Amino acid sequence: MPECSLATADSFSLVQINFNRDSIAAPRLPEWLRKGKTHFEAVHSLKIELRRKGLHTVCESARCPNIHECFSRGSATFMILGNLCTRGCGFCSVPKASPGKSQFSLDPDEPQHVAEMASEMGLRHVVITSVNRDDLADGGSHHFAETVRKVRAALPQSKVEVLTPDFCGDLTAVARVLDAGPDIFNHNMETVERLYRRVRPQAKYPQSLRVLEFAKKYKPRVLAKSGLMVGLGETVEEVHRLLRDVRCCNTDIATIGQYLQPTRRNLPVADFVPPATFDAYRDYGLSIGFRAVFSGPFVRSSYFADKVSEQASRVDDQ
């Protein structure tokens, strides 16, 4: 297995991230980032059904601001391989793993349950993501691939999008997921290279680029996608450089959204990026060859994923 910052299953532990909040004045939330919560009944019903099947969504675990909107229209991003992550990224509120917990084991029925839930919801576009499982020799890639196959069997006419971890740079694991037949392969860069040690301390910028490059070379007909957050202290030129790096891997789709601090334990927001800047990022991305760029304050990598993939696919028809 390629070098990984978490060496063995016995060596990982809960990663506690602490920040000196006294030295950081959090900016006030601007009007364009105020979103009301509605459709409580629909949201509650979907949560009950997910719990009944023992399933998780990144929408809930990552405290996505779009959860009410997406759940109300019957859309959700399934998060597999459990609900505990072996990494401690500064931006993420997904629960972190500690060794020896029984709930850290894999549920062999999870792939089938995801397929059943997606079928019951009548999803035309199914998004599957996962926590990092650096404790597993294959990074969870066999389980990931099996989930894709089960969804494919249950919904043969639907699009399947995967949002994968870096698998510690193990390209065999990446190939395993791609061989299961997703339509869209997504791996998020998350932030600019300078901020990696602070935002993604157990990931590597070049390694994530290699994952994207390999995916497109291995399965050229699969749409490749990557997302990043802004508002963590990056500069415009750094965002442009990241977009160029990602596009050089022949990535088709880019998503750009505002980072919002999910809990007090996470990184503080450095600044709130105005909508006009998101528009400029979109225009820049399109100018360097992306098929589609979805850029806006509330954009997340799987937000309106069906519409974004349709936009990217239409490029071939023009």
Where are the regions that the model predicts?
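Auxiliary Fe-S-binding modules of radical SAM enzymes
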Residues: M1-T77, L81, Q112-S119, E146-Q157, ...
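Core AdoMet radical
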Residues: S93-H113, A118-T172, V177-E213, K225, ...
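Alpha-helical elements of the RecA-like P-loop NTPase motor core of helicases
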Residues: G90, R197, E237
